[in-house]
Amino acid sequence: MLTMIGKRLMFAIPSLIGVVIVTFLLTRALPGDPAAYFAGPAANKEAIEQIRKKLGLDKPLIEQFFRYTADLSHGDLGNSLTTGQPVATEIRNRLPASAELTLLGLVISVAIALPLGVLAATRPGSWIDHLCRITTTAGVSLPVFFTGLVLVYVFYFRLGWSPAPLGRLDVFYSSPPAVTNFYLIDALIARDLETFRSALSQLILPAVTLAVFSLAPIARMTRASMLAVLSSDFVRTARASGLSPSTVIVTYAFRNAMLPVITTLSMVFSFLLGANVLVEKVFAWPGIGSYAVEALISSDFAPVQGFVLTMAVMYVMLNLLIDILYGVIDPRVRLEG
């Protein structure tokens, strides 16, 4: 297992180097002049040129790249022009908000999609099979920002069941003492049920928005994988041996159907990181997605590069976790690794 993990990490290094190079080049190709934006509309050419020199944008591109990689090797992602704060600090402060939202959305979608896919596979042609198909079609068809706007309109404007979509906490509540920077967990640790209730009420609509977006591929893959496994020889043998239907489904079929589902989960999690950008803007969520969008609009290089690099590292770590789960579920993967 350790050998397999080491190999995966070695293969990930060229990918991260490629991400650094491509991100640097793409940010430099963005329209707009960061120096002009930072100087303001009233600045003259001399002032803009002075700021350009201060930011190092007057240097050749190759020199800018080597300076960037040298800073990166020391953990320095640069400073944001719009906020004046170190990008590493901003990302560290905002990442828990995005992670909490993404993880809860994924948990909700998995809690619905896995049972729905299993039931649809074990009862083909039934009403629950048709429900699974309708749900997956709707989840794929609806844009994530449209789903968010509909939920806000229905549950906030029309019914009044949800609080205003303005961040992680209501204005009347203060943040719980920081332990994990996940408000739900920190509020439970502090035994502050009121803050927990407020944080959950703010989190539920954006999390459901992400869950609707991610539910379709998980349910569809679960159904297809279960149908393939249920028609296999070892399942027929288990049934012929007199085992109960629940034992056959849970012990034999479901476990063997999980490998492609886990692969789908890793892809869905990656998609959710991208969909987070739109959801955070709709719900004014203070995560790294909205931070990157604001930086992109203002041609602020450092936050965009920091955001992409953070997403790349998270993606590499996610793939490593998926490989470890493969080894836990299927011992053949450990032997091949």
What are these regions (language model features)?
Residues 15-66, 155-195:
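Hydrophobic alpha-helical transmembrane segments of membrane transport/permease proteins
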Residues 41-56, 147-160, 205-210, 247-264:
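Hydrophobic alpha-helical transmembrane segments
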Residues 3, 7, 40, 50-53, ...:
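Short amphipathic alpha-helical coupling elements at transmembrane boundaries
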